Amino acid sequence: MAKPAKRVAVTGAAGQIGYSLLFRIANGDMLGKDQPVILQLLDLPQAQAAVKGVVMELEDCAFPLLAGVVVTDDPKVAFKDADVALLVGARPRSKGMERKDLLSANAEIFTVQGKALNEVASRDVKVLVVGNPANTNAYIAMKSAPDLPKKNFTAMLRLDHNRALSQLAAKSGKPVSSIEKLVVWGNHSPTMYPDFRVATAEGQDLTKLINDEEWNRNTFIPTVGKRGAAIIEARGLSSAASAANAAIDHVRDWVLGTNGKWVTMGIPSDGSYGIPEDIVYGVAVTCENGEYKRVEGLQIDAFSREKMDNTLNELLEERDGVQHLLG
């Protein structure tokens, strides 16, 4: 007996990340190889023709799991009964644009989308914000959807997590799949703090294997934090395939579970680790039965506290910059 189809809403569907994402979702990479999906694609009126072109390609793949596609410029149509919502579309920063202008332009978008989710999405909708500034955009959407549980709103730090894993694997000479107990704290921005103090590789203590605090502070942390900029510099375009891959990892783990492995998600704070309530902040979680659970009780040393507070202060500044727009 085939499972009933899940409705997956994707915003910014005509964009680069969307193009890398949609075919993999339709192929079952995100929700499982036995889970039919209906894609509900949102983009701006001027992007509708481009989205329709992507839909033609989706049709031409004849994916067995693709049970339907909706294309719209209306958030209430895109989010109708959505089980998963990937909020990829956001206003990019243009030349000469101040960060505060970027914040308010995105606050407008994510207020509208939060309200639409509140009105029409499934009450169990799993929301992942990819569009930057992701943590604050997730906070805005959450605050605009008072009838949905706060825990349904998450921001993507999985790209940072995966970037950190790959750097650690290269440095330690261990397979990337063998590294466990990594966490990336804070904001999806260069202030994030990738922390491998308790991480292991093939069961061995990773700090002992690497044994290079100078590398950690002066190479590893800045490399992970500035990787996005390095890709733009090299390619002339921002990272799209790796961002789409991280979004799929994030949702797959949230829905299907992590088998006890730690992953990083940006989630609304419950006050633990000194993070004020509701701030969407990257922490280590494990997932099972469609729910995430933060890893509690990690020891925070002085260096870590400083790094965690630094990224928190940036998030508080962003929150204060949009607070007046949230009614």
Curated annotation (Swiss-Prot):
InterPro entries: L-lactate/malate_DH, Lactate/malate_DH_C, Lactate/malate_DH_N, Lactate_DH/Glyco_Ohase_4_C, Malate_DH_type2, NAD(P)-bd_dom_sf. Substrate binds at residues 93, 99, 132, 163. NAD(+) binds at residues 12-18, 106, 113, 130-132. GO terms for biological process: malate metabolic process; tricarboxylic acid cycle. Its EC number is 1.1.1.37. It is an enzyme of class 1 (oxidoreductase). Keywords: NAD, Oxidoreductase, Tricarboxylic acid cycle. It catalyses: (S)-malate + NAD(+) = oxaloacetate + NADH + H(+). The active site is at residue 188. Belongs to the LDH/MDH superfamily. MDH type 2 family. NCBIfam families: MalateDH-SF1, PRK05442.1. This is Malate dehydrogenase. It comes from Paraburkholderia phymatum (strain DSM 17167 / CIP 108236 / LMG 21445 / STM815).
